[in-house]
From Swiss-Prot:
Coiled coil: none annotated. The lineage of its organism: Bacteria, Pseudomonadati, Pseudomonadota, Betaproteobacteria, Burkholderiales. Belongs to the ABC transporter superfamily. Carbohydrate importer 2 (CUT2) (TC 3.A.1.2) family. This is Putative ribose/galactose/methyl galactoside import ATP-binding protein 2. Residues 12-31 have a biased composition (Low complexity). ATP binds at residues 70-77. Keywords: ATP-binding, Cell inner membrane, Cell membrane, Membrane, Nucleotide-binding, Repeat, Sugar transport, Translocase, Transport. GO terms for molecular function: ABC-type D-ribose transporter activity; ATP binding; ATP hydrolysis activity. One of its GO terms (cellular component) is plasma membrane. It is an enzyme of class 7 (translocase). Residues 1-31 are annotated as: Disordered. It catalyses: D-ribose(out) + ATP + H2O = D-ribose(in) + ADP + phosphate + H(+); D-galactose(out) + ATP + H2O = D-galactose(in) + ADP + phosphate + H(+). InterPro entries: AAA+_ATPase (IPR003593), ABC_carbohydrate_import_ATPase (IPR050107), ABC_transporter-like_ATP-bd (IPR003439), ABC_transporter-like_CS (IPR017871), P-loop_NTPase (IPR027417). It comes from Burkholderia lata (strain ATCC 17760 / DSM 23089 / LMG 22485 / NCIMB 9086 / R18194 / 383). It is found in: Cell inner membrane.
Length: 527
């Protein structure tokens, strides 16, 4: 276990203002080989159609907390998964304590002193807390069986050291999300790793629990650990991080001491470009209020969301991961019914508890995860496109007007420029962009008045994105009211008449198009 504490800031850092407009990579501040517990050099990683990391570099010094900042899709999580052995890089190298290593999976990374606390908790719900922490490392008695007394004892000792008040014999499934998070942290600490990666560790914690976590982090820092801390919360950066690095669009932008910058400096580094004209939007007349939402909420998820949506309007919804954006869409469409608040359509109160009820009121919902909740991957285009209309105008006397439905699906496929051998091609064989077009076509066949789009261009190429943007703008021009949720700031700013911003389950503001820019939206999204 290390005992040395390395002093804060790195002399010779570039000024934050100079980095704010940078589009390339600048070298991390100089530090000796003995100082670095972890270093990444020129690492790149691509997925089909997407460059997630483009030759990035990154260093973590002993006895420091190094925050990683960037918008959704900046490459932070991909880099951390490479460091933790989950992904294999396409290029570049990783050095641990100055020595190049090849990580052959997460267990290999653990053996080399790198532990990661994932945002998505990875505990076994039907095992006890102690069994989860020491899985694969259980103490054995002289007969080679698990020594349960020793297991409880060493868990209790670990918890005492970390001031965690949880019974080691409790089944994980009975714990709150916050308690599970503390168990995950304790498990990572139990490996006595040199590097701990924490991905949004406070997302489920109360203020009191955050204070407790920060006390643990400071304790680990004093022991000489290198801690990588991924967060969207700027106040946490200034409270706990010694230094931070910013990533943008898969590129490394720069590293600075936390004490040398302001909140606005960081936002400018994360934003880095003027994009307001990248998505030209047609000016169309805005009509009457179609959808009115007042104090909408789902217990424990989001609360007090209020807004109006007019015919021909595109209302963008921005916010960081976990802000509640998608949950609002699910409540509106009856996937997870609202537990409080009121929904009105054309001024009349409606109760929506199922997607079928939402569809009867003229609503359509394109979900954010096309593979898990959108596409029927082993079915063909026709089956996927007709899925939402089989109880609609194509059914008469309990018979489906199959010929008419097929003609309309063919016409929709042509209009959306879906590239495929034909309607009987399995949708899993199509590109992401063409899959998305099929799903949009599915909902357009229902002739919706209110169209909810959750991440409409996620994971598709630039050309397909442009086509979908043109389509959404054209639908608004025909009077469709569009609610568009997106993690891509250029898309939100370029396509929206107004932008609603959410943070941690509550609405923090609605900004008119003329007043919206990335700095203002990011400020509202991190309040």
């Amino acid at each position: 276990m290390f005992t040395a504490r390395v002093a804060r800031p790195m002399a010779g850092d570039d000024a934050p203002a100079a980095s704010s407009g940078s589009t390339g990579s600048s070298a991390p501040p100089a530090s000796s080989a003995a100082d670095c517990v972890l270093e990444v050099r020129g690492v790149g990683k691509s997925f089909p159609g997407v460059v997630a990391l483009d030759g990035v570099q990154f260093r973590v010094r002993r006895g420091t907390v190094h925050a990683l900042m960037g918008e959704n899709g900046a490459g932070k999580s991909t880099l951390m998964k490479i460091i933790a052995g989950v992904y294999t890089p396409d290029q570049g190298e990783i050095l641990i304590n100055g020595e190049p290593v090849v990580l052959n999976g997460p267990l290999d990374a653990l053996d080399r002193g790198i532990a990661m606390i994932h945002q998505e908790l990875n505990l076994m719900p039907y095992m006890t807390v102690a069994e989860n922490i020491w899985i694969r490392r259980e103490p054995k008695n002289r007969f080679g069986l698990i020594d349960h007394a020793a297991l409880r004892r060493q868990t209790a000792e670990l918890f005492e050291r970390l001031s965690i008040d949880i019974d080691p014999e409790t089944d994980v499934r009975t714990l709150t999300v916050a308690s599970r998070q503390m168990v995950e942290i304790a498990k990572a600490v139990s490996f006595d790793s040199d590097v701990l990666i924490m991905d949004e560790p406070t997302s489920a914690l109360t203020d009191k629990e955050v204070t407790h976590l920060f006390r643990i982090i400071r304790q680990l820092r004093e022991q000489g650990k290198g801690i990588v801390y991924i967060t969207h919360k700027m106040n946490e950066l200034f409270e706990i991080a010694d230094e931070f690095s910013v990533f943008r669009d898969g590129k490394y932008i720069g590293t600075h001491a936390s004490s040398d910058v302001t909140r606005d400096d960081i936002i400018r580094m994360m934003v880095g470009r003027e994009i307001t004209q990248m998505f030209p939007k047609e000016e169309v007349p805005i009509g009457d209020v179609v959808l009115s939402v007042k104090n909408l909420g789902v217990d424990g998820v989001f609360r007090d969301v209020s807004f109006e949506l007019r015919a021909g309007e595109i209302l963008g919804v921005a916010g960081l991961v976990g802000s509640g954006r998608s949950n609002v869409a699910e409540a509106l469409f009856g996937v997870v019914p609202a537990t409080s608040g009121e929904i009105r359509i054309d001024g009349k109160p409606v109760r929506i508890t199922t997607p079928g009820q939402a569809m009867k009121h003229g609503m359509a919902f394109l979900t954010e995860d096309r593979k898990d909740t959108g596409c029927f991957l082993n079915l063909d285009l026709l089956a996927n496109m007709e899925a939402a209309v089989l109880s609609n105008r194509y059914v008469k006397f309990n018979f489906v007007r199959q010929a008419q439905l097929k003609r309309d699906c063919e016409e929709m496929s042509r209009m959306l420029r879906v590239k495929s051998p034909g309607l009987h091609e399995e949708i899993q064989n199509l590109s992401g962009g063409n899959q998305q077009k099929v799903l949009i076509g599915r909902w357009l066949l229902t002739q919706p008045r209110i169209l909810i789009l959750d991440e409409p261009t996620r994971g598709i190429d630039v050309g397909a994105k442009a086509e979908i943007h043109r389509l959404v703008s054209a639908l608004a021009g025909k009077g469709v009211a569009v609610l568009m949720i997106s993690s891509e700031m250029p898309e939100v700013l370029g396509m929206s008449d107004r932008v609603m911003v959410m943070h941690e389950g509550r609405m923090t503001g609605i900004v008119d198009r003329k007043d919206a820019d990335q700095v203002r939206i990011m400020d509202l999204a991190s309040r």
